Regions:
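Walker A (P-loop) phosphate-binding loop of ABC-type ATPase nucleotide-binding domains
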Residues: 35-39
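Hydrophobic anchor residue at the start of the ABC signature
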Residues: 143
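Catalytic Walker B motif of ABC-type/P-loop ATPase nucleotide-binding domains
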Residues: 154-158
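Conserved ABC transporter NBD signature motif
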Residues: 56-67, 72-75
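A short, proline-enriched helix->beta-strand linker immediately N-terminal to the Walker B motif
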Residues: 148-152
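Conserved ABC ATPase signature
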Residues: 129-133
Length: 167
């Protein structure tokens, strides 16, 4: 599913990630652990195609993240550390918009949105404007977005940030 070979990222003279190599197979659950500044978020951003590596290669479902980023992204859902949301949309409007961007067919959009709204506990806020949501609910909207389309791979950066324990 994911194959990284000697993945590195430099910012000027600072080396954020140095020669990271690993494989993650379908069905595996993996976490990156390390102190602040260890390169965890940078590695995730490279894997998702949001930040090009300085050197090395990585593939998702066999697609190179640099040469075929759109094909690679079709196989993943990504929840970044800081969730970029459109504050001037209602929760379900935003999720329908994101579903269209992900290529979900018109007749499947509402069932897909309904499913992730339920999975992420968003029903109480589904009609609210995103700008009015708490940090925890904003995080849930980001997770719902990542789950849209039932991706083969889910990449979560600080997924519990702002979430309250349920019961």
């Amino acid at each position: 599913m994911i194959h990284a070979d000697q993945l590195s990222k430099e910012f000027g003279r600072f080396q954020a990630v140095k020669n990271a190599s690993f494989q993650i197979e379908k069905g595996e659950i993996v976490g990156f652990l390390g102190p602040n500044g260890a390169g965890k978020t940078t590695t995730l951003r490279m894997l998702t195609g949001y930040l090009p590596p300085t050197s090395g290669t990585a593939t998702i479902a066999g697609f190179d993240i640099v040469k075929n980023p759109l094909e690679a992204r079709k196989h993943l859902g990504y929840l970044p550390e800081h969730v970029p949301l459109y504050d001037d949309q209602r929760v379900t409007e935003y999720l329908k918009f994101r579903a269209r961007l992900k290529g979900i067919s018109s007749r499947q959009i509402w069932p897909a949105v309904s499913k992730v709204v339920e999975q992420c506990g968003l029903d109480p806020v589904r009609r609210k404007m995103i700008r009015t949501l708490s940090k925890g609910y904003r995080q849930r909207v980001g997770l719902a977005d990542a789950l849209l389309g039932e991706p083969d791979l889910l990449i979560l950066d600080e997924p519990t940030n702002g979430l309250c324990l349920l019961y």
